Each structure stands twice: as structure tokens, then as C-alpha cells.
């Protein structure tokens, strides 16, 4: 579940799980780090979505927030999600995540949602 992929919500499963009192933990909020990469870091496989990436970085710049803040707060605002699971590479990375939680950001954008499995499902990625 992330700013590009809300299939769990769109399908109605997120609400159903909540209605059934199932605690929901989501992961891949950074889409395997893809949402945090700048243009030069992103593997060439993702160039076909260059318009989306340009829109993403412009949107971040316009709102003066980081990709980390946007990715985290988009998911944290979802009332039906109980916990967010993140992976970290280092103590510094963990600190960056904790720092991003310091200031609330209202992230309700849906302009980036995609149903393209070649983008939103890492098992489809080809390098």
C-alpha cells in the first residue's frame, strides 16, 4: 500500500478487514525504495513512467516536502491501516524516517495512483 498503489482500499478489502476487526499492517510504503529515488538513481526500467516521475517530483517541490514525508504520511493518514512496516538500510535511514514523522502532512493526493502492475508490483520488475 503506497501513494501509487491503493488496490487494497479500492477493492473494498481494507474496509472489509476493518469491519471484521482485522488489524491491518502495510508494507512497501516506499515501493522498495522507488518512491524515494531521484531521477538519476532510478533504474532505466522505470523510464517508461518518466511523466509520472516528473509529476511526482514537481508535486513534492511545490509542497516543499520530501518523498519520504509524502510516502509515509499518505499511508499513515489512512484510518483503516493500523501499522506501517518499513525496512531500513542503516541507523541513519531509521533516523530519517523518525524525523519525517515529526511534522504532520495532509497527503490526500490521488493523482499518482496506478494499476500498472509493471510499475506497482515489484515481482513484475525487470532489470
Where do the protein language model's features map onto the residues?
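Beta/alpha (TIM)-barrel catalytic core signal, keyed to glycine-rich beta->alpha loops juxtaposed to Asp/Glu
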Residues: 1-117, 124
Amino acid at each position: 500500500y503506497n501513494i501509487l498503489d491503493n488496490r487494497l482500499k479500492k477493492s473494498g478489502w481494507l474496509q472489509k478487514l476493518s469491519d471484521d476487526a482485522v488489524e491491518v499492517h502495510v508494507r512497501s510504503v516506499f515501493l522498495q525504495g522507488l518512491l524515494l529515488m531521484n531521477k538519476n538513481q532510478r533504474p532505466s526500467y522505470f523510464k517508461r513512467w518518466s511523466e509520472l516521475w516528473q509529476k511526482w517530483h514537481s508535486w513534492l517541490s511545490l509542497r516543499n516536502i520530501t518523498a519520504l514525508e509524502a510516502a509515509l504520511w499518505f499511508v499513515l493518514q489512512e484510518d483503516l491501516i493500523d501499522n506501517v512496516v518499513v525496512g531500513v538500510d542503516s541507523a541513519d535511514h531509521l533516523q530519517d524516517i523518525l524525523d519525517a514523522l515529526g511534522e504532520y502532512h495532509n497527503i490526500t493526493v490521488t493523482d499518482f495512483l496506478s494499476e500498472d502492475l509493471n510499475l506497482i508490483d515489484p515481482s513484475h520488475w525487470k532489470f
